[in-house]
Amino acid sequence: MAELRRDSTSSLQRKKPPWLKLDIPTAHVSVDEVPAFVPPVKRQGFHRSASMPVETSHFHSPQRDIIDHRRAAFQRQSSITQTIKRGTADWFGVSKDGDATQKWQRKSLRHCSLRYGKLKPQVIREMELPSQDNISLTSTETPPPLYVPSSQHGMQKIVDPLARGRAFRMVEEVDGYSVPQTPITPGAASICSFNSSRSGLNRIPRRRKRESVAKMSFRAAAALVKGRSLREGTLRRAHRRSFTPASFIEEDVVDFPDELDTSFFARDIMMHEEMSTFHDEVFESPSDSTMKDVDSKQLDESELTGSALDKSELEKSHLMLPLERGWRKVKEKTPAPPKIRLKQEVVSVNGQRRGQRIGLPVKKLFAREKRPYGLGMVGKLTNRTYRKRIDSYVKKQIEDMDDHRPFFTYWITFVHILITILAVCIYGIAPVGFSQHETVDSVLRNKGVYENVKFVQQENFWIGPSSEALIHLGAKFSPCMRRDNQVHELIKKKQELERNSACCVRNDRSGCLQTSEEECSSTLAVWVKWPQHPSVPQLDGVARQHGSVCHQDPRTCTEPASVSPHEWPDDITKWPICTKYNSGNHTNLPHIDCTITGRPCCIGTKGRCEITSREYCDFMKGYFHEEATLCSQVHCMDDVCGLLPFLNPEVPDQFYRLWLSLFLHAGILHCLVSVCFQMTILRDLEKLAGWLRISIIYILSGITGNLASAIFLPYRAEVGPAGSQFGILACLFVELIQSWQILAQPWRAFTKLLCVVLFLFAFGLLPWIDNFAHISGFISGFFLSFAFLPYISFGRLDMYRKRCQIIIFLVVFLGLFAGLVVLFYVHPIKCEWCELLTCIPFTDKFCEKYDLNAHLH
């Protein structure tokens, strides 16, 4: 080996020109000397607001990395209690670990920029001040180099700080980057440009914006049509991002001792950027004009891009192209001059492009905007903006926020639409209008004659089922959720009248009916009353005092039989339903041998029972009981309420109607209003807070609103998520309050939002709109938003304040909910003047159907 090395050296010396002289000093290293690692030179990071560079450095040592790796293996694992405690603190946003908190705070501030108007000037200015993650000015002002081919590796590198103002290459609008063209220097590369291109992009993970559900569905359908696997396409797809953080970490490590100061060449751009307003492309999608410029300029790429970059060599050197400083998007009012941008695609030597691009219409279809904290959709409608100066810490919190996918919004909207369609298809549509609908017809009554009867039904202007059908489906209705005193007294009065009734048998034996003595004709019929009538049976040797009952007698019923010790009581209201009689056709008992013309029928929604004919019961849309003979043998409230049977037939217990009614709607129009609200306001807020927080606020606000409505409007069937929607509106106020310090005109935004909510409350004073659910849902949603809706913090003191705030508002909400439960179940109240909060009687009959002293039919 030594001889071969000596031969090669001698051959090289023979080829060396006589005029070339190389003096290479020999390095002498002793045996005991430990080789020292030379730390990399610190690179100067330039900020906008600083005239002098700030030095930041990294020191890397292989030995220290090995030691740190070994130490990490012996770290003690945290206990389960600490893990649960830390996870709970992270979920509420009060953890000591600043990563999760800062991520949420950055997202919150970004969301604020689209909802509540312009920010204060100092806030926007502070957002543009240097922070720990801003990209260095050198990397933004120095053009990137062209890649040096392998055949030219031996040539010298040239530092070219004046390489500006040359031709540009075009970047696709998907990436949105604008980078100046590198001057073409044959066989050379700019060292300053090379390190500038590596400044921030190599160390920051290129996180791409999450795709929408529609875009993923479109890609999956395309993969199925082409016969390819969706996973294969996902793995083959390169990692990209649709936006770039507003700053990068300014710590660069270079491999050479010299460093250039380019702040002089960036002075004009710094002055121009300081005068610009805060309008970031992070919050917006690319405009149509920009997309068209991209397509029109792709034809001239070959003349501007220079030589193509070899893909394998480019990956080896980890060359990444920097961003144009600021990556601002010009407002539509003042169109910017056209720029020729650098194409960020990695191109092979033969000129082929990597991957394919979706067409312009598809790009526009799937373009998604990120929701800035404090602004959002409502902020766009009210022209809300940030201040001009925002603290860099607050700005960092906004940038770290990611939009959540509105899974809960899509799920609840799908459920609402599906249930509404099924309800309309099964129960039909009630008469449409705002008044009462009357139907008159001639119907066979219980006395065997035809009579003109009238059926009154409440109209439904929402184009949906009737109130009785909505109660069957699970509407909020107090008599089905507790034992209502008025309904219970009505049933007791009916039982008292029935206890003193008897069977009225016509003289011609053509029919019989259970009535009182006043309703039985003394000339055409006989009122078989015990013990005056000779057909009275005995009970323990004593004549029975109550009876008789048409088609039911203890002596003729065999199942259940009236035998000792299970004899039927003297009180006929406690008699059971007889399911089997004696087979004899003639018993010589007038109330048994007659033809019965009326049986119990449950009519209305208040538990009213009548013994009438089947024809009349069907006309009144009641529930006819063919098997019973007395109203005391049936439970009308069980028929009216439906759903699961009561545990105790005399005590309604369907408390689950408080949240079941949130999924129902009064009609098609009602469902459309909810869908519009949820796909705009609810979807926008869920992007900010996530499905779990929004679902908690949505459901708990709706339950609280329904509970208050059940207290003050007990006899009115209510459906729909009115309380939930006003609880979501309360989230807008909480978000505005938390973003107060960064808004330019917070009082103006508050006034606009307050006017909208007051208008909705005033709209609730009209008939068929429950204002009690609106008010209670708004108050509960306000408390829950302070507890469950995290926000940006402005220091350590603000974090401690939030911890106290979470506890206080949770306690207040629990106290409010407990108070409503006590008023509903323990101490029911009857408020006479409360009806003015839900309906103002402009005329005598305007609020008749909403009277809290409901008429019990």
From Swiss-Prot:
Localization terms from the record: Endoplasmic reticulum membrane; Golgi apparatus membrane
Record flagged with keyword Acyltransferase: no
Residue spans, topological domain Lumenal: 435-661, 715-716, 770-774, 827-857
Entry keyword Lipoprotein: no
Membrane topology reported for the UniProt record: Multi-pass membrane protein
Pfam family, one: iRhom1-2_N
A GO biological process held by the record: regulation of epidermal growth factor receptor signaling pathway
Cytoplasmic compartment segments: 1-413, 683-693, 738-748, 796-805
Membrane-spanning segments: 414-434, 662-682, 694-714, 717-737, 749-769, 775-795, 806-826
SUPFAM superfamilies: Rhomboid-like
Glycosylation: residue positions: N585
UniProt KW keywords: Endoplasmic reticulum, Glycoprotein, Golgi apparatus, Growth factor binding, Membrane, Protein transport, Transmembrane, Transmembrane helix, Transport
Function recorded in the entry: Regulates ADAM17 protease, a sheddase of the epidermal growth factor (EGF) receptor ligands and TNF, thereby plays a role in sleep, cell survival, proliferation, migration and inflammation. Does not exhibit any protease activity on its own.
Entry similarity comment: Belongs to the peptidase S54 family.
Protein name in the entry: Inactive rhomboid protein 1
Organism: Danio rerio (Zebrafish)
Gene: rhbdf1
